[in-house]
């Protein structure tokens, strides 16, 4: 078995999807999980205004709406968290995403002071972190806030990572991958767009250039620039299509060198 086939099998990406069916399957799976775990009453998602959190948020809201109607229980709630670092550059996109999702509850927690306080504490001990490391601190701080909300609302933190990010390790270890469940991990970037289109999402939210936007010195740095490869090529690879040898090497090198992010290595 080639490494490409092994990766596709491990990540569970399908070569072809029917968007409507994929949406319904995810809603039913999430509802069933909440029904089986009776202590869980809320779903928590951090909304950035990007494609992945918009899709995840909408799937969560639809799941909760159906569950409330079926169970006649108002305690089921979807909570959308806005977690900017200072002033968000793409503020309008985030507002548009929130309007599209129409969450039951919305909270805005600015993480800037928490991140800066952590940076200052390290500096007092003679430790100077780089802008890149600070970016990862932002991702972890956002997850801390989400888990605080989950703890006080009997909630489940829902991740927003997709298969294209997973294969390349393009996420913060114990940051945006540190979630309870993930609804879109078996979808590549292209397939996520298909689902949002099916859900009548505003086009600009899934046609915009993806960015993690974690670095102060490189605001709105595009994912594809950071990765050194286009998402459509990664998507082709994950769908089992042939990509040229150079791009294949880039993807597989990223996969192998970020394996530690995807699983804990137990040495004893």
Curated annotation (Swiss-Prot):
It comes from the Bacteria. Keywords: ATP-binding, Ligase, Magnesium, Metal-binding, NAD, Nucleotide-binding. The keyword Magnesium applies. It catalyses: deamido-NAD(+) + NH4(+) + ATP = AMP + diphosphate + NAD(+) + H(+). Pathway: Cofactor biosynthesis; NAD(+) biosynthesis; NAD(+) from deamido-NAD(+) (ammonia route): step 1/1. GO terms for cellular component: cytoplasm. HAMAP family: NadE_ammonia_dep. This is NH(3)-dependent NAD(+) synthetase. It comes from Buchnera aphidicola subsp. Schizaphis graminum (strain Sg). The gene is nadE.
